Swiss-Prot record:
InterPro entries: AAA+_ATPase, ABC_transporter-like_ATP-bd, ABC_transporter-like_CS, P-loop_NTPase
Places the protein is found: Cell inner membrane
GO molecular function, one term: ATP binding
Alphabetically ordered keywords of this record: ATP-binding, Cell inner membrane, Cell membrane, Membrane, Nucleotide-binding, Translocase, Transport
Source organism per UniProt: Burkholderia thailandensis (strain ATCC 700388 / DSM 13276 / CCUG 48851 / CIP 106301 / E264)
EC number: 7.6.2.-
Enzyme class: translocase
PROSITE patterns the record matches: ABC_TRANSPORTER_1, ABC_TRANSPORTER_2, HMUV
One cellular component term from this protein's GO annotations in UniProt: plasma membrane
Entry binding sites for ATP: 34-41
Residue ranges annotated for the ABC transporter domain, each copy included: 2-255
Listed SMART domains: AAA
Name under which the protein is recorded: Hemin import ATP-binding protein HmuV
Assembly and binders: The complex is composed of two ATP-binding proteins (HmuV), two transmembrane proteins (HmuU) and a solute-binding protein (HmuT).
Lineage: Bacteria, Pseudomonadati, Pseudomonadota, Betaproteobacteria, Burkholderiales
Length: 272
């Protein structure tokens, strides 16, 4: 379990997260919804270990507790933490002409038997991760020449390579934190990526927290949905329980209605 208890984050501009608690369970995909500036990326950063609790860091005062598999996050060294959780931040374009394969191989360095020395197995994992991400054809491409969507798929392959199950601990609980992974993707690749995330969460026993802006995507691909508003968790539960017009309006300040899509999966959310 990756969990935050009574997490409180404040900056000079004001309070961002207010005494917030959330749990990310292995084998489960949790989608985090909220309007722009609600604190979603801040919460993800705290769960990733980028904003350690217990003082002031990166211009923020952070209080509360974050634990991974029962161990305080701040007690886990950087290499071991990188083996247990992977983070896909919002898109950032590399400044140097690495190949897509080079980027994906970055996810394997925490697993290197000797510092900085990768094995043949790591190259094989990189190839398989690129295939899972639908990016095999980009293998040798210079990442500075890729489109936003192509780069997003390569970076997704990187975090898959980082969490690739080892033979001796194939189902050890690990965690994947995704910050708007579908923002640059077309419709087909949005669903393909989230389908892959949900399948691997079960097959690899990974707990996933993914920030998404489209509640319709969350309804179809998440096991749980957490809504963040005014620095607090407004709702947290199964999509059918959380995606109600009244809660969506409180979350986004926007009135919606639910339309039956006729596929017994989830209703479609449209403007009221």
């Amino acid at each position: 379990m990756l969990n935050a208890e009574h997490l409180h984050v404040a900056r000079d501009s004001g309070v961002i997260l207010r005494d917030l608690s959330i749990r990310i369970a292995p084998g489960c995909v949790t989608a985090l919804l909220g309007r722009n500036g609600a604190g979603k990326s801040t919460l993800l950063g705290a769960l990733a270990g980028d904003l350690p609790a217990g003082g002031r860091t990166r211009g923020a005062t952070v209080r509360g507790d974050v634990a991974l598999n029962g161990e305080p996050l701040r007690a886990i060294d950087a290499t071991r933490l990188a083996r247990l959780r992977a983070v896909l931040p919002q898109a950032s374009r590399p400044a140097f002409a690495f190949s897509a394969r080079d980027i994906v191989l970055l996810g394997r360095y925490p697993h290197a038997r000797r510092a900085g020395a990768l094995a043949r197995e790591d190259g094989e994992i990189a190839s398989r991760a690129l295939a899972l991400a639908g990016a095999s054809t980009l293998d040798a491409r210079d990442v500075t020449t890729l489109s936003g969507g192509e780069l997003a798929r390569v970076q997704f392959a990187r975090v898959l390579a980082q969490l690739w199950p080892s033979e001796d601990a194939a189902r050890a609980p690990r965690y994947l934190l995704l910050d708007e992974p579908t923002a640059a993707l077309d419709l087909a690749h949005q669903h393909q990526l989230l389908d892959t995330v949900r399948r691997l969460s079960r097959d690899w026993n990974i707990g996933v927290l993914t920030i998404v802006h489209d509640p319709n995507l969350a309804a179809r691909h998440a096991d749980r949905i957490a809504m963040l508003a005014d620095g607090e968790i407004l709702a947290d539960g199964a999509p059918a329980d959380v995606l109600r017009p009244d809660l969506i309006e409180r979350c986004y300040g926007f009135r919606v209605r639910l339309v039956d899509a006729g596929d017994d999966v989830a209703p479609v959310i449209v403007p009221a």
